[in-house]
């Protein structure tokens, strides 16, 4: 109710400024405790999630408010993408609301304060309850991007519930080429070696693009199984452009929100088939309701994430979705989220 009154005011502001105000409100707000485990609790990649709904990477790029996000009702929060060195990202404006389409286009370019600052911030919350994943990336001008990912894995592994390797942002030139089979094997070998193999190290998830050919999907699935990845996050934003009504439709960057829904769902089903259920999947892209989250779970997602829908629906969306998921799980006769995964 409160957000419905605030939204017209926020939408008069530049999208990036409004995002900054939202971060500030969470940082200085009263805060709430992380959600306790309940009927939606699920175990994925050795991690106990109080519910399967997460905040996707991109909202909290520097790990400033993970606990505040958990307090909104999310079962987990993914911070980042974080790169070894600070970088400003692409020139502004670089974030656009496509209101008529329920969508967002961004070309942020991995803007963040760098690994050292984020690590200090995240180290200060160690011991707090809640699942916090850390999404890692490479600097735009790096001479050795694989070394960037490896150094970030080593730095963040002690601080993360899981690591998410982002090779699918369309806003860093050449980054998506790391999804090619040979490059991806070398990258993951570097990340896994840097993370270590002793008990208690966080699982590694890989975030992939929706704009993949069938051969790419099969290769990534084989690699994920071979490298024993904790999960595949399906998917990042798309560079494709379905028909859009907004005046910002022609902006360069990654498209997210409602127009991504069908593509992301199709890609999730592709990865479910390609992996045979051997690797947990995280469904993300165009989810804005409990029904859509449930659809993604039934299609094979062990976990789901949202972000763009929060822009339009506000901070109450997480609790609305989890409440709806409980009702849908009961309606369809499932005893747990895990039982429903891939049941379509």
Give short role names for the model-derived ranges.
Residues 1-34, 92-96, 101-116, 120, ...:
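Alpha/beta catalytic cores of nucleotide-metabolism and tRNA/nucleoside-modifying enzymes
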Residues 23, 27-28, 32-35, 170-183, ...:
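Glycine/Thr-rich beta-alpha phosphate-binding loop at enzyme active sites
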Residues 47-54, 128-136, 196-212, 273-283:
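Short beta-strand/loop segments at the ligand-binding rim of alpha/beta enzyme cores
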Residues 62-69, 150-151, 212-226, 273-277, ...:
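Catalytic cores of alpha/beta
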Residues 73-87, 167-169, 231-241, 286, ...:
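Glycine-rich phosphate-binding active-site loops on the catalytic face of alpha/beta enzymes
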Residues 85-94, 115-117, 123-125, 171-202, ...:
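Active-site-adjacent beta->alpha loops and helix N-cap segments on the catalytic face
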Residues 95, 101-164, 169:
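Active-site beta->alpha loop and helix N-cap motifs at the rims of alpha/beta catalytic domains
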Residues 138-150, 177, 183, 206-226:
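Active-site glycine- and acidic-residue-rich loops that bind
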């Amino acid at each position: 109710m409160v957000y419905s009154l605030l939204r017209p005011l926020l939408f008069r502001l530049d999208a990036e400024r409004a995002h900054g105000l939202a971060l500030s409100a969470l940082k200085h707000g009263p805060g709430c405790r992380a959600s306790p485990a309940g009927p939606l609790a699920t175990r994925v990649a050795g991690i106990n999630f109080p519910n399967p709904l997460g905040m996707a990477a991109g909202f909290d790029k520097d790990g400033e408010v993970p606990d505040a996000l958990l307090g909104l009702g999310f079962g987990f929060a993914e911070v980042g993408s974080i790169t070894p060195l600070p970088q400003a990202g692409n020139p502004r404006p670089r974030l656009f609301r496509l209101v008529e389409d329920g969508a967002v286009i961004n070309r942020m370019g991995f803007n963040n304060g760098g690994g050292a600052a984020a690590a200090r911030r995240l180290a200060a919350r160690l011991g707090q309850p809640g699942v916090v994943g850390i999404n890692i990336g490479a600097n735009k001008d790096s001479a050795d991007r694989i070394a960037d990912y490896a150094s970030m894995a080593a730095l963040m592994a002690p601080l993360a519930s899981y690591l998410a390797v982002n090779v699918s942002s369309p806003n860093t030139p050449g980054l998506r080429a790391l999804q090619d089979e040979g490059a991806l094997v070398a990258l993951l070998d570097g990340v896994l070696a840097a993370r270590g193999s002793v008990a208690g190290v966080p699982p590694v998830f890989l975030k992939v693009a929706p704009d993949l050919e069938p051969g790419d999907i099969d290769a990534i699935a084989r690699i994920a199984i071979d490298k024993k990845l904790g999960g595949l996050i399906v998917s990042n934003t798309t560079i494709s452009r379905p028909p859009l009504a907004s005046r910002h439709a022609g902006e360069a960057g990654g498209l997210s929100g409602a127009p991504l829904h069908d593509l992301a769902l199709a890609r999730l089903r592709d990865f479910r088939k390609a992996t045979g259920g051997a690797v947990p999947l995280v469904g993300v892209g165009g989810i804005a309701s409990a029904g859509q989250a449930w659809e993604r779970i039934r299609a094979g997602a062990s976990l789901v994430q949202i972000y763009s829908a929060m822009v339009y629906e506000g901070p109450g969306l997480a609790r609305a979705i989890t409440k709806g998921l409980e009702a849908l799980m009961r309606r369809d006769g499932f005893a747990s989220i895990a039982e429903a995964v891939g049941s379509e």
